[in-house]
């Protein structure tokens, strides 16, 4: 009998670091299941989760403050290996009898760590060799406090020029602490260090693979829904597309996909969705032409949040009407992913002990009485894309740039009109087409066009024209929390501008947005 892919599992306790989700993603990439819980989890909950090992993540607080977060005492008596990272190392040191103090030399950025003792955590890990023969590592630091004394039973494993305790270890108890961040790519050997902990020290097997995730999801969905029918709101986005493919494998024609064309999609997107999922993959899919309904409800509204709510509410109305026609549908499938689940719980610095449910379809009415099927709720976005590839979905679709839920409704500034949407989708298609042609699309993180509700004078031949303005937006980012505007070649921008103005009657001027995030947001609305 094959093993459950959740049999070996790592518990990551979150103290509020911006890098905490990165730790979880790195552990998953190694091939081991893990979950992210708040630092104030109870002993009973840890026992219930039954982790193979525990990682204490970083955080913005100071261990020297009396009310700052601490790991539950049970972490140190549970009998499993523990790794503390940055703040996690500091709270481990303080809780086990060592000392922590505010450092006069704060470290933020690259640092060279010298290994001065053997440890299972650093087995076969080095970037270079120092003059004294010790291994050196290039790592990423981000800390103001530092360990001033290690607990009894620990040895100092690594140091930097300004940090005497860069890493510590108690090999007997399998407790380890590192002051740097192995989860970020700037720490070159970071993945190897985490693999040493998860695989060699915790003895986890690599059971968490794309193929095993698919098999597990299909088995669970079959058991959950039995012979019942399931409905899915298919948008053509990554998450709902992967859910559709998983359910199709699990229950075949018992799945009905509802695709709502709201008139706010990208050029030819509706037909592409129908061709791919209906004709190519053979899914049972219903297309609802609802452009007039959405645009009529949006008429006269210019406030961004109000537009979002209208689009969401009309979608619910349309989806509910179609669902009522399917008498035997007992389940609603959703593309909820793990970051949604994390965000729906209280933040790591709050007081929620339990991960709470999250519904990514905004407020479907309770009276619909449909059970929820959420096969992606354990997965990060990169994992969803990988299993999408395994399921046969095309790379270009899975790795397409993000598109907002309200679609062009929030890329048209102010009131939404059919004329504006038609102009915008054509201009956007030209921009994206040229990015692909010039091999730039995969080198930027997100690119799109924005419709501005202002007119500008132009000249076409001998005639004066007075038409609309669009803005090109293109950014580069790692996490979408911060972003820099893309320094696209001037010749390329000129080409895109000329094509848009010459090929689209109704646009007289193209501008390029050179705002970073912060202070601007990536989307305009």
Curated annotation (Swiss-Prot):
It holds the Pfam family NAD_synthase. The active site is at residues 86, 181, 183. Keywords: ATP-binding, Glutamine amidotransferase, GMP biosynthesis, Ligase, Nucleotide-binding, Purine biosynthesis. CDD domains: GATase1_GMP_Synthase, GMP_synthase_C. ATP binds at residues 235-241. SUPFAM superfamilies: Adenine nucleotide alpha hydrolases-like (SSF52402), Class I glutamine amidotransferase-like (SSF52317), GMP synthetase C-terminal dimerisation domain (SSF54810). One of its GO terms (molecular function) is ATP binding. It catalyses: XMP + L-glutamine + ATP + H2O = GMP + L-glutamate + AMP + diphosphate + 2 H(+). Its EC number is 6.3.5.2. It comes from the Bacteria. It is an enzyme of class 6 (ligase). The keyword Transmembrane does not apply. Residues 9-207 form the Glutamine amidotransferase type-1 domain. Homodimer. Catalyzes the synthesis of GMP from XMP. This is GMP synthase [glutamine-hydrolyzing]. It comes from Colwellia psychrerythraea (strain 34H / ATCC BAA-681) (Vibrio psychroerythus). The lineage of its organism: Bacteria, Pseudomonadati, Pseudomonadota, Gammaproteobacteria, Alteromonadales. The gene is guaA.
